[in-house]
Amino acid sequence: MKLRLSALALGTTLLVGCASSGTDQQGRSDPLEGFNRTMYNFNFNVLDPYIVRPVAVAWRDYVPQPARNGLSNFTGNLEEPAVMVNYFLQGDPYQGMVHFTRFFLNTILGMGGFIDVAGMANPKLQRTEPHRFGSTLGHYGVGYGPYVQLPFYGSFTLRDDGGDMADSLYPVLSWLTWPMSVGKWTLEGIETRAQLLDSDGLLRQSSDPYIMVREAYFQR
């Protein structure tokens, strides 16, 4: 289980709120809203409170913060080559080289990426939200495709989530076995969910949490 079913959408929701009314709606569609609401109720009202959230609580309470930071740095470092490629594909060689530098320094000097040496050495090399292949497709005007809520996964569109699968074709991600990839996704999902535990009430208090999560997904 990828365990990002609530973390990704909820995290973005807390950052951007419901300020979607003035955003560009081009390429967004929700033709399966009835099905999606059913899957949302399962993911957020059954799976999250009974499985995902308890795991996140245990992770926050019993795993030391330095260990959590190191694991987060390590999994993020694995994505740096793919982020570099996507920036080059988007015609931004400067940012591509930034992420090459991050990967090189953190892998060589940061114990394989457990320590963010690059970010500590230079503010311009701070860790940022990764640009994945879905972002590259969006850069060239490819639409999202239908919005879908998938069981055990959460928000999904063919462009952003399906397109992101292309990133697994680049090293280092291409070197991971399927169990390794599942482990990486699980760690990332648990950590993100743990960071949001104190903000659960904001989503629960929404008059329509499904719409809030859907719009937050498109505002990432």
Give short role names for the model-derived ranges.
Residues 26, 131, 135-220:
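A structured, mid-to-C-terminal "fold-capping" secondary-structure block
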Residues 71-74:
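Beta-rich strand-turn-strand
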Residues 77-155:
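Mid-length scaffold segments of soluble, non-membrane domains
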